[in-house]
């Protein structure tokens, strides 16, 4: 599924409207993979289908200088393990700030304004998801065992970074990350 596949996936029209509203009202938004691609294209960036920057598997991501200072990545090492599963890739929109890159894909994360972030990598996966995705696609199914083994080897640092990043986002969105409740003034 890609950013322009609204005929095949009509719900994307509503998702795009939701993203536009979040950006307009500065409602905290974290777009992951397709979500980051949708955010990028709605902000004037370009998304390349079947990009040479497509990545699948467990890979290193490097924060830029701006990424090291961004509150989404507070407490996260300059280089960290990520999980990638994308054929398409986004170009950072003109008014956005590049936060992270990888050796294969210059745009791994960006921020627009104070409350909208897009990532190409997946901070939300676990072993079951990695195994499912690897077996799901004809291209990757013969290598599913390797994808899962690579993820398991990197799982501990991956989980530490993912939990920190997602916790940072929830805190920025106004949730008390100690007990999962919304902060009240």
Where are these regions (language model features)?
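Acyltransferase
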Residues: 125-185
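Catalytic nucleophile loop
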Residues: 22-46
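Conserved catalytic-core motifs of eukaryotic protein kinase domains, centered on the activation segment
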Residues: 6-9, 41, 51
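Pocket-forming structural segment of enzyme catalytic cores
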Residues: 43-128
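Flexible gly/pro-rich beta->alpha loop and the following alpha-helix that scaffold active-site loops
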Residues: 1-30
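Residues at alpha-helix caps and immediate loop-helix transition turns in enzyme cores, especially N-
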Residues: 7-11, 94, 129
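Glycine-rich, phosphate-binding/catalytic loops in enzymes
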Residues: 11-15, 47-48, 101, 135-137
